A protein has these predicted regions:
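Active-site-proximal loop->helix
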Residues: 19-29
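Conserved C-terminal alpha-helix-loop-beta "cap" of PLP-dependent enzymes
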Residues: 4-7, 197-248
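Active-site C-terminal subdomain of aminotransferase-like
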Residues: 37-38, 64-65, 69-71, 79, ...
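Conserved PLP-anchoring active-site segment centered on the Schiff-base-forming lysine
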Residues: 2-18
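PLP-dependent aminotransferase-class I/II
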Residues: 28-73, 80-87
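General beta-strand structural signal in soluble alpha/beta enzymes
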Residues: 10-11, 70, 78, 99-103, ...
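Catalytic PLP-binding core of fold-type I/II PLP enzymes
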Residues: 80-112
Length: 248
């Protein structure tokens, strides 16, 4: 999708910026991080960055923004509203930027209580998105959906060149055929959300505080270091990030 001198705008907390081992940079494209609020970026931020780049007379010395990356839910479990998503999409179309939505946990975003974003909304707003399989019951894989006709041509060449074309690719596709029969994909996602809310309520009763107020199954509990060490005596555990000098 991108030419060698083009980069990807995303939230500074975005998955490709913090938890992908530099994968985007490894393919030759710089991640252009924007300050996030509760894991999200806005259409206004994207427009301001775009305008700043194209008003720079020496812009050919700088990586050109060409794609916007967001995830739903975000890396911290928050959700975009329909209005926020449409606003980002509008800005991207006006500026000639591609909008990519990371849907690894999309099922949980769609089934979270209070959300007004639907799968058709995502398809309408994004140039490319993918439907997460691994985190919603599949053995492996994600389903890439390209809605922009200009990006569809030769995409299979890219898949093959990057080592993503499986000899037994039918095994990947059949999982999604089953997941989308009789609403199973959404049933699995809703069950996970329901269980996460039970866990959240129980932890709140125990006095634990949360990094974000998330309605998804991404629940980040703030834990004292001493308690974390105590847990480690019995279980394998990692933390997302340091919260302060004595908490994770």
């Amino acid at each position: 999708i991108l030419r060698p001198f083009q980069g990807v705008l995303c939230a500074d907390s975005g998955h490709i910026n913090v938890h992908e081992t530099g994968a985007v940079e490894a393919t030759g494209h710089k991640v252009l991080a924007l300050p996030s609020k509760e894991g999200k970026i806005t259409g206004q931020q994207i427009k301001e960055y775009y305008d700043l780049h194209w008003s720079d007379e020496s812009r050919e010395h700088i990586v050109q923004p060409k794609m916007v990356y967001i995830s739903h839910p975000t890396e911290v479990g928050t959700l975009y509203t329909k209005n926020e998503l449409e606003n980002i999409s509008t800005v991207c179309k006006e500026c000639g930027l591609y909008l990519f939505l990371d849907g690894a946990r999309m099922g949980y975003g769609l089934m979270a209580p209070g959300t007004d974003v639907t799968l058709p909304d995502i398809a309408k707003c994004c140039d490319v998105f993918y439907i997460g399989g691994t985190k919603v019951g599949a053995l492996f894989g994600e389903a890439v959906v390209i809605t922009n006709p200009c990006l569809k041509q030769d995409f299979r060449y890219c898949i093959k060149q990057k080592g993503g074309m499986l000899a037994k690719g039918r095994l990947l596709g059949v999982q999604f055929l089953e997941l989308f029969k009789n609403g199973l994909y959404f049933e699995i996602s809703k069950h996970a959300i329901d269980m996460a809310m039970l866990l959240k309520d129980g932890l709140k009763e125990k006095g634990y505080e949360f990094f974000m107020d998330s309605n998804t199954n991404q629940q980040f509990i703030i834990v004292e270091d001493a308690k974390l060490q105590e847990i480690r005596q019995k279980y394998g555990v990692t933390y997302q990030e340091r919260y302060d000098e004595t908490h994770s």
